[in-house]
C-alpha cells in the first residue's frame, strides 16, 4: 500500500524525517512524491529507503512536460517507474476542448520521451475533465487521443466521482481497462 506525499503536506514542512517515521509506523511501504524542500533527490531517497519506503511514482508539472528530461532525471534518481502530471491549466471551471487538445499533444510528446527512458507517464484526473463532449466527456477525448504506448492514467476515485458521478470510476475502468496504471483512493 502506498500514500501520496500530498496527504502529509502539512507535516513535511515541519520535519521530513519525522513525517517519514509516521508513514513507516503506519506500515506504508510506498510513497508517491519527490524530494521535499531542503533535500536533494538522493538524500530524500535515502531517508525513504532507510525506513523501507520506496518511491514508485513522482510528479511533474504540466509546464515541465515541454522539456521532460529533468523530470526523467528526477524520477530515475528517486527510483520511480512512473511520472504523474496532476493538472492541465485552464480558466476556472471552464475546461475546454482546446485545453484537452493541447494536453493530448503535450502528453503524447512527453510520454514518448518518458517511455524511451524506461518510465511510464500517467495523467491524474481532477474532475474538471468530465465536461460533456460528443458521445462522452473530455476525459474520454483525452484517453482516446493519447497514444497508449506513451500515456497511461492514474484514476483519483474521488475526483472521478466528483466530476462524472458515482458510477464513473467503474465505467472508465471497464471502458479503458488497459489505460489505468495507478489509483488514488481516499478514505473519508
Where are the regions a protein language model picked out?
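Active-site environment of divalent metal-dependent phosphoester hydrolases
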Residues: 38-40, 129, 160-161, 188
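Short secondary-structure boundary segments
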Residues: 35, 87, 187
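Catalytic-core regions built around general acid/base machinery
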Residues: 43-50, 106-116, 172
Amino acid at each position: 500500500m502506498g500514500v501520496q506525499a500530498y496527504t502529509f503536506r502539512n507535516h513535511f514542512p515541519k520535519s521530513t524525517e519525522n513525517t517519514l517515521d509516521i508513514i513507516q509506523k503506519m506500515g506504508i511501504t510506498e510513497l508517491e512524491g519527490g524530494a521535499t524542500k531542503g533535500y536533494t533527490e538522493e538524500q530524500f531517497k535515502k531517508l525513504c529507503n532507510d525506513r523501507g519506503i520506496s518511491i514508485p511514482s513522482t510528479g511533474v508539472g504540466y509546464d515541465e512536460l515541454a522539456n521532460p528530461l529533468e523530470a526523467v532525471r528526477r524520477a530515475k534518481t528517486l527510483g520511480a517507474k512512473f511520472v504523474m502530471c496532476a493538472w492541465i491549466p485552464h480558466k476556472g471551471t471552464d475546461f475546454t476542448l482546446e485545453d484537452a487538445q493541447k494536453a493530448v499533444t503535450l502528453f503524447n510528446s512527453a510520454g514518448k520521451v518518458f517511455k524511451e527512458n524506461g518510465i511510464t507517464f500517467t495523467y491524474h484526473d481532477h474532475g474538471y475533465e468530465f465536461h460533456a463532449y460528443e458521445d462522452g466527456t473530455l476525459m474520454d477525448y483525452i484517453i482516446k487521443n493519447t497514444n497508449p504506448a506513451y500515456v497511461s492514467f492514474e484514476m483519483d476515485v474521488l475526483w472521478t466521482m466528483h466530476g462524472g458521478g458515482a458510477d464513473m470510476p467503474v465505467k472508465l475502468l471497464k471502458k479503458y481497462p488497459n489505460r489505468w496504471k495507478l489509483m488514488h483512493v481516499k478514505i473519508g
